[in-house]
C-alpha cells in the first residue's frame, strides 16, 4: 500500500537550523518482561552501505516504549525482507508472534523508498497486519522509520504511537557568550536544533497543543519574564513581566489559555491568561505558595504544587473557583506534577526518606508507583500517548535527561555532549 509521506511543518523548518551535537539514548534497564517481537534489519537494495539503519530505529522505538522486547539481531532465525519470505514456525518457536520486515532502495533525485510490513506469525502462512511505503529525502529517513514504528505500535497495542514527537529542553554550556540554549530534538535525541540562545538563564519550556509554539521563562531583561516563541518564524512575544517571580507556563489542552505563576502579591500563586484577549485572572490565593501548574484534559482544572499543608504536595483546583483537593498523600513531599494526556494519572517528583524520584500516581485508585532510581530527579514530562516519561537527573557534577516507560520496565539515559541538560518538555503529536 502506498501513501504520500506527510511531514510536520515544524520538523521541516527546524531542520533548516544548524545541528548541534546529538543527545543519544543509552539503555540503563531493559525490558525482558515485555512482549517479544522480531524486527529484521531492513534490506538495502542500493550500492555501498545503507544510508540509515531503519530496522535498528524501529527496534529502538519499540523497546523505548517499554511494551516490546525486540529480539537481538544475533538471535534472528532468518532475515526476510518481505512478508512472503517469513517462515512463521521459525519465529513462533522463539515465542514471537509478530515480525517487522522491510527494505530501503534508492530512487530518483537522491531520494529513497522505504517499505515495511508487519507480519502476524501465529498462522502459517503469516498474515500482514500493517504495511506502508514512503518516498523521502535522505534527511527524512529517520522520520520514515519513526512512522513505521508508530503504525506498528498502534496496530499491536491499540495506542497511538509517539515516536514522531519531539522534546524541548534547556542546555547550560560551560562557556561562551550564550551559555543557555533552548533546544528541540526528536524524542530520542536525534536532530537536535537550537531555538533560542541567551547569556541569561532560560527555564520551563512548554509546548502549545498544536506544537507550533513554546512558552518559556527568560531573564534577558534583568528579571524573569514569560515569553511565547513561534517555532517556524522565531518570533518571540512577551506575555508577562510582573514584579518579582514570573514562571512555570503551561498551555491549556484546547490552546485558549496559558497558566503560569506570579509572586507580585508576595507569595507565589497561579494565574491564567486568556490568549485571545490577554486578560489575566488569579486562580489561587492565601499565604501558601502555589506553583507548577499542569492542566487536566478539560482545560478547566489544574494540578499544582502547594505548601498549604506545610510541605509541598500536589493539589488540583478548578480555575473558575472551588475548594482545592489534595491529590498526593504518600511521601514526605510531592511536587512538579505532569498530568497524563488522558487525565488518568500524573507523574511527579516524590521525596521519601531523603530520596527524590519520579513517581506515577493513579488518579482513580491513588496507587503510587516509583518509576526511577536515579539521583535528584526533576521535571517529569509525559509523552502524548502516556507510555513514556522524560525527566532530568543529576549525574556527577551535571544533569542529564532520562527516559522511563510509565510501567517502569524500560529506562534509558540521553547523555548530553556539550553541557548540562534540564527542563525537558515532551511535545504533543506532530
Swiss-Prot record:
Leader sequence residues: 1-21
User: Subunit comment for this entry?
Assistant: The Tol-Pal system is composed of five core proteins: the inner membrane proteins TolA, TolQ and TolR, the periplasmic protein TolB and the outer membrane protein Pal. They form a network linking the inner and outer membranes and the peptidoglycan layer.
Name the UniProt key words of this record, in alphabetical order.
Cell cycle, Cell division, Periplasm, Signal
From what organism does this protein derive? Sodalis glossinidius (strain morsitans)
Q: Does the keyword NADP apply?
A: no
- Role summary: Part of the Tol-Pal system, which plays a role in outer membrane invagination during cell division and is important for maintaining outer membrane integrity. TolB occupies a key intermediary position in the Tol-Pal system because it communicates directly with both membrane-embedded components, Pal in the outer membrane and TolA in the inner membrane.
Biological process (GO) annotations held by this record are:
cell division; protein import
Concerning its family, UniProt says: Belongs to the TolB family.
User: What protein am I looking at?
Assistant: Tol-Pal system protein TolB
Q: Where in the cell is it found?
A: Periplasm
Short name of one Pfam family for this protein?
PD40
Q: Tell me which GO cellular component terms the UniProt record holds.
A: periplasmic space
Q: Which residues form a coiled coil?
A: none
Amino acid at each position: 500500500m502506498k501513501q504520500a509521506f506527510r511531514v510536520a511543518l515544524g520538523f521541516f523548518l527546524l531542520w533548516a537550523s544548524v545541528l548541534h551535537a546529538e543527545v543519544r539514548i543509552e539503555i540503563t534497564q531493559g525490558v525482558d518482561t515485555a512482549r517479544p517481537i522480531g524486527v529484521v534489519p531492513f534490506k538495502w537494495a542500493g550500492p555501498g552501505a545503507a544510508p540509515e539503519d531503519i530496522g535498528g530505529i524501529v527496534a529502538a522505538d519499540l523497546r523505548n516504549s517499554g511494551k516490546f522486547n525486540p529480539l537481538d539481531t544475533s538471535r534472528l532465525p532468518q532475515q526476510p525482507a518481505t512478508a512472503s519470505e517469513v517462515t512463521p514456525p521459525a519465529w513462533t518457536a522463539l515465542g514471537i508472534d509478530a515480525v517487522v520486515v522491510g527494505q530501503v532502495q534508492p530512487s530518483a533525485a537522491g531520494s529513497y523508498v522505504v517499505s515495511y510490513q508487519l507480519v502476524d506469525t501465529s498462522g502459517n502462512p503469516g498474515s500482514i497486519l500493517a504495511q506502508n511505503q514512503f518516498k523521502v529525502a535522505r534527511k527524512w529517513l529517520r522520520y520514515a522509520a519513526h512512522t513505521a514504528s508508530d503504525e506498528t505500535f498502534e496496530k499491536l497495542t491499540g495506542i497511538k504511537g509517539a515516536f514522531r514527537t519531539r522534546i524541548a529542553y534547556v542546555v547550560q554550556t560551560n562557556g561562551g557568550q550564550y551559555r543557555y540554549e533552548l533546544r528541540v530534538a526528536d524524542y530520542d535525541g536525534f536532530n537536535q536544533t537550537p531555538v533560542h540562545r541567551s547569556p541569561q538563564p532560560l527555564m520551563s519550556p512548554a509546548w502549545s497543543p498544536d506544537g507550533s509554539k513554546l512558552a518559556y521563562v527568560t531573564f534577558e531583561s534583568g528579571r524573569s519574564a514569560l515569553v511565547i516563541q513561534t517555532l517556524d518564524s522565531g518570533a518571540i512575544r512577551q506575555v508577562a513581566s510582573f514584579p518579582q517571580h514570573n514562571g512555570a507556563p503551561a498551555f491549556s489542552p484546547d490552546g485558549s489559555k496559558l497558566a503560569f505563576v506570579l509572586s507580585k502579591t508576595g507569595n507565589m500563586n497561579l494565574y491564567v491568561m486568556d490568549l485571545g484577549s490577554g486578560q489575566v485572572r488569579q486562580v489561587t490565593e492565601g499565604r501558601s505558595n502555589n506553583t507548577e501548574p499542569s492542566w487536566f484534559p478539560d482545560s478547566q482544572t489544574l494540578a499544582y504544587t502547594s505548601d498549604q499543608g506545610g510541605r509541598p504536595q500536589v493539589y488540583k483546583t478548578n480555575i473558575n473557583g472551588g475548594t482545592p483537593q489534595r491529590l498526593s498523600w504518600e511521601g514526605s513531599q510531592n511536587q512538579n506534577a505532569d498530568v497524563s494526556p488522558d487525565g488518568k494519572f500524573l507523574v511527579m517528583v516524590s521525596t521519601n526518606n531523603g530520596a527524590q524520584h519520579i513517581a506515577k500516581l493513579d488518579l482513580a485508585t491513588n496507587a503510587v508507583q516509583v518509576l526511577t532510581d536515579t539521583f535528584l530527579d526533576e521535571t517529569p514530562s509525559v509523552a502524548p500517548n502516556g507510555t513514556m516519561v522524560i525527566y532530568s537527573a543529576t549525574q556527577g557534577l551535571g544533569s542529564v535527561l532520562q527516559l522511563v516507560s510509565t510501567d517502569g520496565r524500560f529506562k534509558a539515559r540521553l547523555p548530553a555532549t556539550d553541557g548540562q541538560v534540564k527542563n525537558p518538555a515532551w511535545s504533543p503529536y506532530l
